[in-house]
Amino acid sequence: SPENNDTVKINTGALSETYVFNWGKAESGLGSPITYTIVFDKPDGDFSNPIWSKASDNSGSNAMVTLTLGELQEIYNAAGASGVASVKWNVKVENGSPNIKYGQVANSLNWHLVVLALEILH
């Protein structure tokens, strides 16, 4: 979650409140630990140079990340929009091996191309 085309309203008076993103857990065929990084990009981006990223909860080991509304405001600002900003998010999955490509790391890798609208409330 969130679902496609969800709108998150960012209350600038409550920037410490949180919003949770979660996804299906990946498994490494090598038995090595999996780490996750959530990445955000503009709707026309390809995630090669995301506008914002953060390791998931528990130092990257959980299949979820808890972001504050302040962090969502950073993403909103990085999107360079005013009014409602549309962004998409994805999850980068790694197992620590530089020789393993994404498709080989996990047998249940979920790529999220979710469009999310962020709106600032004053």
Report each predicted region and the residues it spans:
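Solvent-exposed loop/turn segments flanking beta-strands in beta-repeat/beta-sandwich domains
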Residues: 14-19, 26-57
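Short, surface-exposed loop and linker segments with low hydrophobicity and enrichment for Pro/Ser/Thr
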Residues: 24-33, 77-84
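Extracellular/lumenal ectodomain signal focusing on beta-strand-rich modules
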Residues: 37, 49, 86, 107-110
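An aromatic-rich alpha-helical recognition segment common to small helix-rich domains
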Residues: 23, 38, 89-91
